[in-house]
Curated annotation (Swiss-Prot):
The keyword Transcription regulation is annotated on this UniProt entry: no
Enzyme class: isomerase
Gene3D superfamilies: 3.10.50.40, Porin chaperone SurA, peptide-binding domain (1.10.4030.10)
GO molecular function, one term: peptide binding
Main localization category: periplasm
Example of a GO biological process term: Gram-negative-bacterium-type cell outer membrane assembly
Protein name: Chaperone SurA
Domain PpiC: residue ranges: 179-280, 290-388
PANTHER family the UniProt entry points to: CHAPERONE SURA
Keyword tags: Chaperone, Isomerase, Periplasm, Repeat, Rotamase, Signal
Entry's free-text remark on domains: The PPIase activity resides only in the second parvulin domain. The N-terminal region and the C-terminal tail are necessary and sufficient for the chaperone activity of SurA. The PPIase activity is dispensable for SurA to function as a chaperone. The N-terminal region and the C-terminal tail are also required for porin recognition.
Amino acid sequence: MHNHVFKTIARHGLIALFFFFSISAMAAEVAKMDRIVAIVDQGVITEKELEDRIQTVIAQLEKQGTQLPPRDVLQKQILERLINDRLQLQYAAQTGLRVDDAQLDKTIERIAEQNKLSTGEFRKALEAEGIPYRKFREDIRNEIILARLREREVDNRVNVTESEIDNFLTTQSSRNDIQDEFEVAHILIRAPEESTPEELQKLKAKAEAALKELQSGADFAQVSAGYSDAPNALEGGILGWKASSQLPSLFVDALQALQPGQLSPVLRSPNGYHILKLLNRRGGSSPLVVDQTHVRHILIKLSEVVSELEAEQKINSIKERLDHGADFAELARQYSEDASANNGGDLGWTNAGDTVPAFEKAMNALDINEISAPVRTPFGWHIIQVLERRKQDMTQESARLKARQEIRARKADDAFQDWLSELRDRAYVEYRLEDKY
C-alpha cells in the first residue's frame, strides 16, 4: 500500500518536474525573443523582430547566390536599417501619414496581378512559402508609408533648374567618353558633413579595409553587405547599367581607367568614401529618332449624370455633323470636354505611349486628315483626326530629360540622407544588442 502511494507520488512528481522544466524552457525562449535589442524614442525593437529580418535577408542573399557576411556584421547592418525604418514610421504616425485598409488592399491586388494570381491565390502562395499573410500586409503597409513619407518630406521639395541641366550637359559634353555606358557595383562608406578629422580617418580606414578584403578575393556582394552604407548594400551594391552622363565625374574618371572585373581605389566625395567595381562596359546609344503624330480630338466624358448611351449618342451626332462638312476645331471648342477644347482639340505632337492604347491604335490607323469613327477609351468617347506625321530626332530632348532625372535623383538622395540624419539626431536611440552576450 505504502509502496503504491510512494510510486504514485513519485510518478506525479516526475510529471510535475517535467512540466516545470518545459514551462521554464518555454518562458526562457519567449523572454529571449522578447528581449529588447534597441530603444528608439518611445518604441523598441525586439530580438524577434531583428531575427525575423535577418532570416528574410539571408534567404534573399542565398537566392541571389551571394556569400553571407559574418553574422555579427549582418546583424548590425540590419539593426541600423530597422532603427531608421522605425524612426521614419514613428514620424509618419506623429504627422498623420497613414495607409488605410482600402489603399492597402488595392496595392496587394496589383502585386497579385503582377504575379498573374488572384488575391486568394497570392495569399495561398505566400503561406506556402512560410510568410504569414498578416505580416506581409503590415510589411507592405510600412513600405507604402516610408515611400510616401520620403516623397512628402524630401522628393517633392527637390527642384531642378534649367541652368543646372545646362551646366550638367556642358560638363558631360566636354568629355570624350560621353557615349560610354558602365555596369557598376558600388560600396559607400558615408561621411557626415559634421565629421571630425579623427572620425574621417576612421571612416577612410574602414573603406580601405573593405578594399583590402576585395583585393584578397572576397565576394563583392558579401563585402557590400558587411560594410556599405548605400541603400542597396544588402543587394550586392549593384547599380546596373549607367550612362556616363548618369554618373559623377569622379566615378567616370575612375571607371575609364578600369577593365571589367577590376576595382577602383578608395574615392573621396563630399558624402563619403567609395569603392567601384567595373562589371562591364559598352558603347553608348545611337541618336534617338521617334515617330510623332500631330493629332486633335473631341472628347465626350461619362459621368454620374451622363450615361454610356447618352455619351455615345452625343458623339455619334457630332461625327455625323463632321461627315457633312462641319469644322472640326469649332465643334471641339463647342462640345469637347478635354482641356484641349480651347485649342480646337489640338493635342500637338505626340510620341508613342503618350496616349492610352485604344486611342493610339485608332490614331495610328488613320491617314493624314482622316477622321476616325467614335473611339471608346477609359476617358470616354473620342473622335480623332490626324493632321501630320514626322520623324523627329529627340536626342537632345532625351538628353535633357535624362539629365533632369539624374540631377533630381542625386539631389533627392543627398537630401534624404541629410533629413534622415537630422531625424536620428533628434531621436533617442539606445543599443542593447550587446546585452545578449
